[in-house]
């Protein structure tokens, strides 16, 4: 099945993934990252890490909580076109113009563009709910869309 949304004859087999499914996918990803990162920072900094007022407690904090998640997300996007959360909902990231796999440059740009989406009161994330193609600002800046196959459920009921 081709991922090409504009030229492939099966482009109608895909739908844009909306706000709430993407929130669910993000929650799955957040829990997975928390399960990995929280024990690591606790191992390095001890339980006092969780009561500190410091934004960043040291180089290991940056590596574990900022760099490791960025690398993990970009690697998943590169090889699977989705994080585990998006995989769980059957979604994947594709180039907005061709429907094909996005370039590594697009994916890195998409990750960095999340900060643009998040900083102004999460407005760029909420934008997904109102955009006709269900693109957040990070998708628009990177030239990507999130899609999944239509008719994901069981066969229709027949009598």
Could you say what each language-model-derived stretch is?
Residues 1-122, 136, 140-143, 147-159:
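Short, small/hydrophobic-residue-rich motifs at membrane-helix boundaries and re-entrant hairpins
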Residues 125-133:
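Low-complexity, intrinsically disordered Gly/Pro/Thr-rich segments
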């Amino acid at each position: 099945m081709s991922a090409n949304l504009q030229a492939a004859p099966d482009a109608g087999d895909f739908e844009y993934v909306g706000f709430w499914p993407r929130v669910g996918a993000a929650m799955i990803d957040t829990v997975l990252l928390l399960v990995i990162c929280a024990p690591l920072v606790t191992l390095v900094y001890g339980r006092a890490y969780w009561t500190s007022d410091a934004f960043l407690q040291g180089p290991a904090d940056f590596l574990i909580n900022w760099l490791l998640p960025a690398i993990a997300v970009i690697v998943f996007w590169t090889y699977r076109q989705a994080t585990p959360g998006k995989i769980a909902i059957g979604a994947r990231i594709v180039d907005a113009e061709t429907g094909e796999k996005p370039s590594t440059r697009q994916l890195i740009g998409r990750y960095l563009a999340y900060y643009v989406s998040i900083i102004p009161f999460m407005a760029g994330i909420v934008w997904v709910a109102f955009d006709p193609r269900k693109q957040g600002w990070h998708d628009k800046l990177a030239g990507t869309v999130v899609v999944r196959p239509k008719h994901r459920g069981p066969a229709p009921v027949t009598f």
